[in-house]
């Protein structure tokens, strides 16, 4: 029984509510034991390396010299958004007011369970050492960003050895900014780094890392007719199973769906989640594919607006590659959101856009897109430009794995020869028009992404947003 839970706290405004009382200390033996489910959490759970690495070495090919490195990263592990937290708290309230003794998969709730959202001020925010439920939690966004910085130095440190001053770019989302700052902290005090905070408001127009926010034509509910075809009866199965174990509980399919988010965000905040153990492996697979479907048709190749939106950043990336010999800065690091990265990868063509995902069943052999592989919390997409003898090449590294361009990968380390790459890039953006497709002029006069080139004179420092 969970008599300590107080509905007035849970139902209070998520902005103004106070701290939820603490329960017992987390069981440290469980922390770090659930990594096998990370790929099934739709990108809401902790960072993990891209599983489909094809066995290609991440190292720079022999006798080659790196010329430029670009990185577009997602913010690190975080607490749920306000809207998602409302759903989680609604389900938590139902559990906390259950008057019986919990049995079966929910029996852990009998033992003074401590709800992981202890303070609603943490909603939307990065998980840190300070706000984590357990100080031993290895999955905080803070620690992830600092580990990423150390990995960056190990892989590319020589690129910044003689470049002690350079810029790092972030959207003005608080959690993206925090990730960028923790990354900078992880680099140490050797560098003089200028953190440029770029607006993600629609008024930013094209001069943003978050182009979909500047797109009035963007439809959050696009392709719902396709998504509704997906069989979600497994959710009612979860609810029925738990209700059968606990008479009078009355969980619904909505509660069952909420448990997946609860599982992911609790791991981010605590280091493990007993809620995750209520699912069968089949249920995790079905949920994961549902997330793949939603992403593919609403922020990926299945939505025709996306390719134009992603072209805003991809065009800037290609321009930087072409200017690598004249630019003093050789490393370009940016932090933003998962949607922006998915748009970017869609335009690049890394995500297959030739075979639409089916909503009729869970495909296995035909499914090449897995949302969480590309955008777990703390995701990172590197663009490498390197020279071997007299030839220059480009390749992509996604979450620690080299992911070749399918039609252009005959160079060293399965890279793409530079002129072939530029030709490929032209084809990828042919027919795209971010400004026109999105009707950007209705919200902004900004028609070009310029912050990579004018940061030293404009000094971007937009007000941080709690989102």
Swiss-Prot record:
Q: Which cysteines are joined by disulfide bonds?
A: none
One of the entry's Gene Ontology molecular-function terms is: acid phosphatase activity
Instruction: Give the active-site positions.
Output: 75, 338
What are the protein's UniProt keywords? Glycoprotein, Hydrolase, Signal
A single cellular component GO annotation: fungal-type cell wall
Concerning what turns on (or off) its expression, the entry says: S.cerevisiae has 2 types of acid phosphatase: one is constitutive and the other is repressible by inorganic phosphate.
Q: What is its EC number?
A: 3.1.3.2
User: What does the PTM comment state?
Assistant: Glycosylated during secretion across the membrane.
What Pfam family does this protein match (any one)? His_Phos_2
First-level EC class = hydrolase
Q: Which reaction does it catalyse?
A: a phosphate monoester + H2O = an alcohol + phosphate
Positions of glycan attachment: 97, 162, 192, 250, 315, 356, 390, 439, 445, 461
Enumerate the CDD domains for this protein: HP_HAP_like
Q: Where is the signal peptide?
A: 1-17
Kindly give any further remark recorded in the entry.
Present with 3290 molecules/cell in log phase SD medium.
Family under the similarity heading: Belongs to the histidine acid phosphatase family.
Question: Would you tell me the protein name for this molecule?
Answer: Acid phosphatase PHO12
Organism classification, top ranks? Eukaryota, Fungi, Dikarya, Ascomycota, Saccharomycotina
């Amino acid at each position: 029984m969970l008599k300590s839970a107080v509905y007035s706290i849970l139902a209070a405004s998520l902005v103004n509510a106070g701290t939820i009382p603490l329960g017992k200390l987390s069981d440290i033996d469980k922390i770090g034991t659930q990594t096998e489910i990370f790929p099934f959490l739709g990108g809401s759970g902790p960072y993990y390396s891209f599983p489909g690495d094809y066995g290609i070495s991440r190292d720079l090919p022999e006798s080659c010299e790196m010329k430029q490195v670009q990185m577009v990263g997602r913010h690190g592990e975080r607490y749920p958004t306000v809207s998602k937290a409302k759903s989680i708290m609604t389900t938590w309230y139902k559990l906390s007011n259950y008057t019986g003794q919990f049995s079966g998969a929910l029996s852990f709730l009998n033992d003074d369970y401590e709800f992981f959202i202890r303070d609603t001020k943490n909603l939307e925010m990065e998980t840190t050492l300070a706000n984590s439920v357990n100080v031993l939690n290895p999955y905080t966004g803070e620690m992830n960003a600092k580990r990423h910085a150390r990995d960056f130095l190990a892989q590319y440190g020589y690129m910044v050895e003689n470049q002690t001053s350079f810029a790092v770019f972030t959207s003005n989302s608080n959690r993206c900014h925090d990730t960028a700052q923790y990354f900078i902290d992880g680099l140490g005090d050797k560098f003089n780094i200028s953190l440029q905070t770029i607006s993600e408001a629609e008024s930013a127009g094209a001069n943003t890392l978050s182009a979909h926010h500047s797109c009035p034509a963007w439809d959050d509910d696009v392709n719902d007719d396709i998504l509704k075809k997906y069989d979600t009866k497994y959710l009612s199965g979860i609810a029925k199973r738990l209700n059968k174990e606990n008479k009078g509980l009355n969980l619904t399919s909505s509660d069952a769906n909420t448990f997946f988010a609860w599982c992911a965000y609790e791991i981010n905040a605590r280091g493990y989640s007993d809620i995750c153990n209520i699912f069968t492996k089949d249920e995790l697979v079905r949920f994961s594919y549902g997330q793949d479907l939603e992403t593919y048709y609403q922020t990926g190749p299945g939505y025709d607006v996306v390719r134009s939106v992603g072209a805003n950043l991809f065009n800037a990336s290609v321009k930087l590659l072409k200017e690598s010999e004249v630019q003093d800065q050789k490393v370009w690091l940016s932090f933003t959101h998962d949607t922006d990265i998915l748009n970017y990868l869609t335009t690049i063509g890394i995500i297959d856009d030739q075979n639409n995902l089916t909503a009729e069943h869970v495909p296995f052999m035909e499914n090449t897109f897995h949302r969480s592989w590309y955008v777990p919390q703390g995701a990172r997409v590197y663009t490498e430009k390197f020279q071997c003898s007299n030839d220059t090449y480009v390749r992509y590294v996604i979450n620690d794995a080299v992911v070749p361009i399918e039609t252009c990968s005959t160079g060293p380390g399965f890279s793409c020869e530079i002129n072939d790459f530029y030709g490929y890039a032209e084809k990828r953006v042919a027919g795209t028009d971010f400004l026109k497709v999105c009707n950007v002029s209705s919200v902004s006069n900004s028609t070009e992404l310029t912050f990579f080139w004018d940061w030293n004179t404009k000094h971007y420092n937009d007000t941080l947003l709690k989102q």
